[in-house]
Amino acid sequence: FNFRDCEFEKCRFVNCSIKNLKLNFFKLIDCEFKDCLLQGVNAADIMFPCTFSLVNCDLRFVDFISLRLQKSIFLSCRFRDCLFEETDLRKSDFTGSEFNNTEFRHSDLSHCDFSMTEGLDINPEINRILSIKIPQEAGLKILKRMGVVVGG
């Protein structure tokens, strides 16, 4: 399906299943998604301003490419086979989320909160990671990628 020239403002989507959707010239303003499934969604042509929150959602095969998503909320979400590429996520909150085969490429993750996440793997050579909060496991992966061995 293709949504074109649509605008949703102050909408709340609960227990929705949104699959195989392309968003062209699409606006989300102060929208909340709770307990939703988003699968096969291409958000590359979303319009701005764009403000939304996702709480306890499943995201599968969702591409966030060349987007400005500062201060977005992704609480307790499950990301599977997702891509964040050239996306500005500064000050976004991913607390309690799980990442499985999900990549961040050339994205700004400055001041993001990844507390209590699982499966997070961020390459510091291709992402901006200034002042981020990450779990110890993710920190060790970053150090290992940089050639730093932590041991006693």
Q: What are these language model-derived features?
A:
Residues 1-152:
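Tandem repeat scaffolds
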